[in-house]
Amino acid sequence: MKIYKRMESFKQEAALLVPLYKGDRIPDEITELLGYDVTNDICLNYETINETLTMGKAEVKKIIFAGLGEKEKLTRSKLRKFMGKLARKEKGKICVWLDSLDEDKIFDIVYGMYYSMYSYLPKEDGILSYASDKDVEGDIRKAMSCAAAINHARHLGNTPPNHMHPEDVANDAKRMAENLGLRYEILTNKELKEMGAGALLGVNQGSAHEARLITLWYQGDGDAPYTALVGKGITFDSGGYNLKSAAGMHWMKLDMCGGANVLGAMQWLATKKVKANVMAVVAATENMIGPDAYTCDSVLTSLSGKTIEITNTDAEGRLILCDAITYAQQKGAKRIIDVATLTGAVIGALGTTYTGVFTNSDVFYQELKHAAEKTEEKIWQLPVDEDFHSQIRLSDVADMVNSVSGGKGGASLAAAFLEEFIEDGIEWIHLDIAGSADTDNGEGYRTKGATGAMVETMAALFEK
């Protein structure tokens, strides 16, 4: 989607969009252009659309007066969704009148339009122009770069699995790091075996493609401690020998959305030059069946040295995450947020719009909650305590099991498993985005597929 500065550079078929609050008068320039005042003829309730043809009086064919409703009731998400739907309706060929709007609203309008116009398959570029006497180009560029970061995460998740193997995730992360000046490290099976990352390697055994452990560093705050964003990057999940059903296997390319969204958050932070020190650790592998694939009853030794009895090969995400979490701590992270499409149980509990949150720190959770309130992403805290830890530790042959049969409290049990690998003094949050990571029906605001869940909230956590 391209952006131009003035409507003079616009095509004849484009529309001029004028967003107005309830009670606003039509800008004098628009009245002069039309030759009459239409203020009393239009309704400006939220999501009302009033169109009028210019009859050759302007370089655009029509003017759209978009009702924003009452100013105090307009939320960021409502504005983004409405503007995004309008952008898709007009196929991006739209000029936006921005003179009457403040910086935050300009950001949300451009962000919503840019987000909504994303498509995995290449299409004709939309052409977003703007009309304003104010200096808003910086605000627009900022919104574009942030939307580009979340769309990058969405694109990684939406890419077909035969084009997005672990090495492809690593190559994408490398390109991004080099473009943004980030330090990076990519480990392959040889290094992972030498360091003892047995949980990640165990999951990888059935795949024809080697695993990758990808680490990026963004240093924007001198010698301050690092926070790690740890992402699950299962590029395709067959379930292993606990094989998924046909319906359950469909869309399992999206099982890497945790890793993709972590990379998107890093792009956002680096582009905006946020004052923070953040590392991203993404464990990438397929979970497949094959002659060497791991099986139930196997015992894996994790990077931490703790042993894990495999009771379900389809509970693989927590296995690759536990090694990534340990590695982040070895690299000096003092705070950890792990992100994963981890359990179907969280969908049963919270549906498809909320992200489940688990933590060992009320202080850290309140910071995340404040960030989520700012971005208007929906989160909900769920329990993780000794009731769940005691079940995870019930193994006769290892320190713990990777899954507990019975299907009760599955999201909390998965979180408890991960917390077993959090060292003393480390603040930790687990985000289960199994429900919020994708949408299976293309809404007016966004296309079918990956949503980029929690990218913006993770970034907002570091923005002061």
Could you describe each region identified by the protein language model?
Residues 1-233:
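Short amphipathic alpha-helical segment within the helicase RecA-like ATPase core
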Residues 1-4, 43-46, 58-60, 163, ...:
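A generic structural signal for tightly packed, nonpolar segments enriched in small/aliphatic residues
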